[in-house]
């Protein structure tokens, strides 16, 4: 058996680990759709319900050139699957950059050990392999020091939240229910959401209108001026009005509004005349009121019963009349008795 001369190549360990050769990512060849391999046409975006006011897609996912397509005739570039022209399909350039990767969330900070708990320690093997007393001293110091809670990771999570708008073909397939549904939602930062609305705390409260207060003297002076002007402002009276307004202490516009509002109260307009006529008519229709000068005589007292007979209750006059009649009859009987004798 022949001896073989074998040479071993020494291995090199940079930084204590073997570096693996990075393999380049395989690039898939782009599929050309009648454009000479330069561009790729994806899903069909033609709206088949545009005449009805809606939005409907045919579902074609990629442009496939028909056998009768001629690059020299642009009108013949139609899809063999859906029959639509190539311009209705979404154009995707070959050298378009890949979409950005999703943001990586930061790992949560490790929780510090509580007092009285033992944590596993990862120790690297030393030269000697023995342990010194300094490790135990350090562990006692770790147990005795105060434990502070970790900071909340809310700020880091909010800072890494990035909004990626949807692709145009996805926005077109949402339907024609409204423009508000096609627009991407706005992302508001926590600071902007917590900030109060501009304009103070009033918000939508309407502003209260300022009302001018007049004193009794100002009202009297304005009434005198209005009566002098005939409750009308004319151009020839501007100098007088300006002078009186300076003396009274009110503006010309304020005096004009006051005169217009109180014209019917002091002048007696149509409403005042109507109320006066109605009150006079009511007074004329009412009968005159004459209070009695002397009280009426009292009614006679009711009769009182003085005797009782078989016929009922008799008054004193009736009893007297009956007694008189009885006496007369007795005298007649006495006078007739001697004659008969």
Swiss-Prot record:
DNA-binding interval(s): 207-270
Stored InterPro entries: Homeodomain-like_sf (IPR009057), Homeodomain_ZF_HD (IPR006455), ZF_HD_homeobox_Cys/His_dimer (IPR006456)
Region annotation Disordered: where it falls in the sequence: 93-154, 180-207, 269-315
GO cellular component: nucleus
Biased composition, class Acidic residues, residue ranges: 128-143
Location(s), subcellular: Nucleus
Keywords: DNA-binding, Homeobox, Metal-binding, Nucleus, Transcription, Transcription regulation, Zinc, Zinc-finger
One GO term (biological process): regulation of DNA-templated transcription
Bias kind Low complexity: ranges: 274-287
GO MF annotation, one: DNA-binding transcription factor activity
ZnF start-end (ZF-HD dimerization-type): 41-92
Site, as annotated: Required for DNA-binding: 259
Domain of life: Eukaryota
Subunit structure comment from the entry: Homo- and heterodimer with other ZFHD proteins.
Domain comment quoted from the record: The homeodomain differs form the typical one by having namely 4 instead of 3 extra amino acids inserted in the loop between helix 1 and helix 2.
Protein name per the record: Zinc-finger homeodomain protein 9
